From Swiss-Prot:
Gene3D superfamilies: Cytidine Deaminase, domain 2 (3.40.140.10). It is found in: Cytoplasm. The gene is eIF3f2. Component of the eukaryotic translation initiation factor 3 (eIF-3) complex, which is involved in protein synthesis of a specialized repertoire of mRNAs and, together with other initiation factors, stimulates binding of mRNA and methionyl-tRNAi to the 40S ribosome. The eIF-3 complex specifically targets and initiates translation of a subset of mRNAs involved in cell proliferation. Component of the eukaryotic translation initiation factor 3 (eIF-3) complex. The eIF-3 complex interacts with pix. Belongs to the eIF-3 subunit F family. Transmembrane segments: none annotated. This is Eukaryotic translation initiation factor 3 subunit F-2. One of its GO terms (biological process) is formation of cytoplasmic translation initiation complex. Coiled coil: none annotated. One of its GO terms (molecular function) is translation initiation factor activity. Pfam families: JAB, MitMem_reg. It comes from Drosophila melanogaster.
Amino acid sequence: MSRNFSMRAKVYLKPLVFFQIIDAYDRRPKGDNQVMGTLLGRNKEGHIEITNCFTVPHKEHSENKRIDLDMAYASEVLELNMFAYPNERVLGWFCTGKSVSRSASLIHDYYVRECCEGQPLHLLVDAALKNQRLSTRLYCAVEMGVPGGTKGLMFSLVPLEISNENSDLVALRCIEKQSQQQASKQMERFVPELAQVVDATRDMQHRLDLVLRYINDVLARKKKPDNVVGRSLYAALTAVPLLDSDKFRVMFNTNLRDMLMAITLSTMIKTQLEISEKLSCMQDQ
């Protein structure tokens, strides 16, 4: 094993990587049983964080179970990614499936040359969603064999932890809520992004009502004050800048206009791509 990697290192995975892999698996070409690609992220003194990924086209040979990667494509996409996210580095590769493939050793050799910060990691994702669960395992290759003889690689499991920030949790809760219940007819009239803002505002209003009710009960001596709750409320209040209602209204409306403009532009681009795709299909026919 590389001296730069420790089995005790903490590896964290961003939820965005899951969505990118699942999306690539759903959009895979006909005839392909799996998708694979490059894992990107940061490695700081044993704290490894997988934050991004991109797929790499490959060709499967059924006669010998060999897989050939399009290395030229991988190098070009990696170079473009470095312009957008200069802090991200290659950490390894991912693959969909139930078990480590026979070509994992050859793919490992390629990513050994690409990884500048330690041993490449191998993320295996079972995108078939067996039992409605996304099975995920992380491996690291370990050299094994007789000294002076033939050596091989054994892929050993590495502990993996899902890293969720506050912004990630908001999106995940929204996805979970939409997956568990159908949108009502009243909410269908809203733009989806605005409906999420309305739900978040209602939830915040409910939480504020609970806090105000607790404070009023403490002031009226109906409840015994709790120092832990008081310190938490103080930290929450001091974390928010003090703004009057007029400034807050202007700031909120400005951000809302920016969001509506982004929604409009993204809708126009989506429509243009759909029209372009239909025109290209008509020309092929």
